[in-house]
């Protein structure tokens, strides 16, 4: 995901 966001694990 984006830098430090909660979606990191989902979006890649």
UniProtKB/Swiss-Prot annotation:
Disulfide bonds: none
Broad class of where this protein is predominantly found: secreted
Keyword annotations: Secreted
Annotated tissue distribution: Expressed by the venom gland.
Record's subcellular location: Secreted
The keyword Methyltransferase is annotated on this UniProt entry: no
Keyword Secreted: yes
GO cellular component terms, semicolon-separated: extracellular region
Descriptive protein name: Venom peptide 6
